[in-house]
Swiss-Prot record:
Residues reported in the UniProt entry to bind NAD(+): 191-219
Pfam families named among the record's database cross-references: Ldh_1_C, Ldh_1_N, UEV
Gene behind this protein: Uevld
InterPro entries, A to Z: L-lactate/malate_DH, Lactate/malate_DH_C, Lactate/malate_DH_N, Lactate_DH/Glyco_Ohase_4_C, NAD(P)-bd_dom_sf, UBQ-conjugating_enzyme/RWD, UEV_N
GO molecular function: oxidoreductase activity, acting on the CH-OH group of donors, NAD or NADP as acceptor
Coiled coil stretches, renumbered: none
Function comment: Possible negative regulator of polyubiquitination.
Signal peptide range in chain numbering: none
PANTHER family (alphabetical): L-2-HYDROXYCARBOXYLATE DEHYDROGENASE (NAD(P)(+)) (PTHR43128), UBIQUITIN-CONJUGATING ENZYME E2 VARIANT 3 (PTHR43128:SF33)
Quaternary structure, from the entry: Homodimer.
UEV domain segment(s): 2-145
GO biological process: carboxylic acid metabolic process; protein modification process; protein transport; small molecule biosynthetic process
Annotated family: In the N-terminal section; belongs to the ubiquitin-conjugating enzyme family. UEV subfamily.
Protein name: Ubiquitin-conjugating enzyme E2 variant 3
Length: 471
């Protein structure tokens, strides 16, 4: 079948990089001439919809001496080729999905090639070649008896409506045990912050296994040093599937450099997370996702939307470090006779953070609290947020989560419904943390007009930026 360049060009319509996409699909047709192209509505996890080019067909997979034609579907995002395709199996009525390392229960395909996608070195032809190689190791589909076909038709009707997501269904081909690892933690990103988190968590001794996912090309200096000095229970990998069964997955990776505007910088982070979060959520379906990537409020929201996890299991590091410092300043530097544990820094990381009291501290009058907060916040401003200090703060949060300490931390959580907020935004609020993430948001003092006004202003600006992002 001859590739119809002009027909595909018309289908691409308003795609940003139409010529590049047409050229790549033309190359695909040389090896796979029978793919069929169309434009259909793609439903994202946040229920938003977009008309996207997609193509379907089969790829030949040799398994145990026999060739199987595996039906697949590729969705091409409008930012292609700078964003990877979204890939699904397309089983017929007599086929059933075999959930495994690279396929979830809804047929979505996860591969290292997708996670490491980078134009121009990445291409759909290369992706298909890796797909074939992985499926030769573990066949993603198997036939079902004819008596079960009616049931499968219903399932397929459901699958066609589902485009993304994580299922907690335990199906054949996927291990049902936890590999006998009690406390496994994954750190995503091998930059300075990722290394700092790895070292701080290792020093606390709270992980039976600690995995550092290195997303860089080649080996970074930090990961090379970790390899050389061989920390106990620490493993370095580039394979996302190595993170399977983690109790906490920590996102430290950032892709903010070289962008022409703040919006473009944040969008580049979102694009990276689009390839990471669904796969990592698939491999660790009961994990708490701890976000340290910047801007933490927005990236926590993005992680929540892409993972489809309950909001309680997506936690941003928020103002935990500033809160711990503030409490230390009040009790140890200013020598105030109070526990210091009833005051937190809340809101948005950066200049818009604000001090808030829980109302349980009966030692200080409201006016004394206000004066103390002002003095303490002035001292707090001289403190930076270097990687090692953030790493210690992350380790503190992980310790509370892993050991179910139910301590109060000021962390980024879904703030809708608090302080009169109506939008889905993440802001730092005092929360009780445990193995399930956020179990409760602590109420602070009523009538704090400054706090309420600051949080509402932050929420408004964050929501406005989120509306401009492409998830």
């Amino acid at each position: 079948m001859e590739f119809d360049c002009e027909g595909v060009r018309r289908l691409l319509g308003k795609y940003k990089f139409r010529d590049l996409t047409v050229e790549e699909l033309k190359n695909v047709s040389v090896s796979f001439p029978h793919f069929r192209y169309s434009v259909d509505t793609y439903v994202f996890k946040d229920t938003s919809q977009k008309d996207l080019l997609n193509f379907t067909g089969t790829i030949p997979v040799m398994y145990q001496g026999k060739t199987y034609n595996i039906p697949i579907r590729f969705w091409i995002l409008d930012s292609h080729p700078f964003a990877p395709p979204i890939c699904f199996l397309k089983p017929t009525a007599n086929m059933e999905i075999s959930v495994g390392k690279h396929v979830d229960a809804k047929g979505r395909i996860y591969l290292p090639y997708l996670q490491n996608w980078s134009h121009p070195k990445s291409a759909i032809v290369g992706l298909i070649k890796e797909m074939i190689a992985k499926f030769q190791e573990e066949l993603p589909l198997y036939s079902i008896p004819s008596s079960n076909e009616a049931q499968q038709v219903d399932l397929l009707a459901y699958i066609t409506k589902i485009t993304e997501g994580v299922s907690d269904i335990n199906s054949r081909g996927w291990t049902n045990h936890e590999n006998k690892i009690l406390n496994k933690i994954t750190v995503v990103g091998s930059g300075d912050l990722g290394i700092a988190c790895t070292l701080a968590i290792s020093a606390k001794g709270i992980a039976d296994k600690l995995l550092l996912l290195d997303l860089s090309d080649g080996m970074s200096q930090g990961t090379m040093d970790l390899d050389i000095f061989n920390l106990p229970n620490v493993e370095i990998s580039k394979d996302l599937s190595a993170s399977a069964h983690s109790k906490v997955v920590i996102f430290t990776a950032n892709s903010l450099g070289g962008s022409e505007s703040y919006l473009h910088a944040v969008q580049s982070n979102v694009d990276m997370f689009r390839a990471l979060v669904p796969a990592l959520g698939h491999y660790s379906q009961h994990a708490v996702l701890l976000v340290a990537s910047q801007p933490v409020e927005i990236m926590s929201y993005v992680t929540w939307k892409l993972s489809t996890f309950p909001a309680t299991r997506v936690v941003g590091i928020g103002c935990n470090l500033d809160s711990q410092r503030l409490q230390y300043i009040i009790t140890s530097v200013l020598k105030v006779q109070t526990s210091g544990k009833e005051v937190w820094v809340v809101g948005e990381q950066g200049e818009n953070k604000v001090c808030s009291w829980s109302g349980r501290d009966g030692v200080l009058s409201p006016s004394s609290q206000a004066q103390l907060s002002s003095r303490a916040m002035e001292l707090l401003k001289v403190k930076g947020q270097r990687s090692w200090s953030v790493g210690l703060s992350v380790a503190d949060l992980v310790d509370t989560i892993i050991n179910n300490k139910r301590k109060v931390h000021s962390v980024s959580t879904l703030a809708k419904g608090y302080y009169g907020l109506d939008n889905e935004v993440f802001l730092s609020l005092p929360c009780i943390l445990g193995t399930g993430g956020v179990s409760e948001v602590i109420k602070t003092k009523a009538g704090e007009d400054t706090v309420t006004g600051t949080l509402q202003a932050s929420a408004s600006s964050i929501h406005a930026l989120q509306q401009q992002l492409e998830l």
